[in-house]
């Protein structure tokens, strides 16, 4: 099953376990957010929204907040010794799609537990 969602003015086709980068969404790392603007649900019997599918949402886990690549805008007016250089970086949220929900259901899965790094085993002294 797949869904077409709209967030940040862009549309994305998603399936469960997809990882995607979208414009900044409020939420702490590791929390589950719900994306409510579902334009289409696909599968055996596709549902097309007018403009959105009623009662459908997509649950996603926030993996990271970061900044995108620098975009430079350079304007030059020839023969006038006039130029302007500006740059910016978008704020990006990395999401993992956990579930596609229909009929107003709530997400059944909570946030995944944090990974704990395994402590290295104490090295046995070879000299003894």
UniProtKB/Swiss-Prot annotation:
Keywords: Ribonucleoprotein, Ribosomal protein, RNA-binding, rRNA-binding. SUPFAM superfamilies: L21p-like. One of its GO terms (cellular component) is ribonucleoprotein complex. GO terms for biological process: translation. One of its GO terms (molecular function) is structural constituent of ribosome. Residues 104-128 are annotated as: Disordered. InterPro entries: bL21-like, bL21-like_sf, Ribosomal_bL21. Pfam families: Ribosomal_L21p (PF00829). Residues 119-128 have a biased composition (Low complexity). Belongs to the bacterial ribosomal protein bL21 family. Part of the 50S ribosomal subunit. Contacts protein L20. This protein binds to 23S rRNA in the presence of protein L20. This is Large ribosomal subunit protein bL21. It comes from Rhodopseudomonas palustris (strain HaA2). The gene is rplU.
């Amino acid at each position: 099953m797949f869904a077409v969602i709209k967030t940040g003015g862009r549309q994305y086709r998603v399936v469960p376990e997809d990882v995607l980068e979208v414009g900044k969404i409020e939420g702490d790392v590791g929390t589950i957010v719900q994306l409510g603007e579902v334009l289409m649900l696909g599968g055996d019997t596709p549902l097309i929204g007018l403009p959105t599918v009623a009662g459908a949402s997509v649950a996603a886990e926030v993996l990271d907040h970061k900044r995108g690549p620098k975009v430079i805008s350079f304007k030059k007016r020839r023969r006038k010794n006039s130029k302007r250089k500006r740059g910016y970086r978008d704020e990006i949220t990395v999401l993992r799609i956990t579930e596609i929900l229909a009929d107003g259901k709530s997400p059944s899965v909570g946030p995944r537990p944090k990974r704990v790094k395994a402590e290295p085993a104490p090295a046995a002294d070879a000299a003894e």
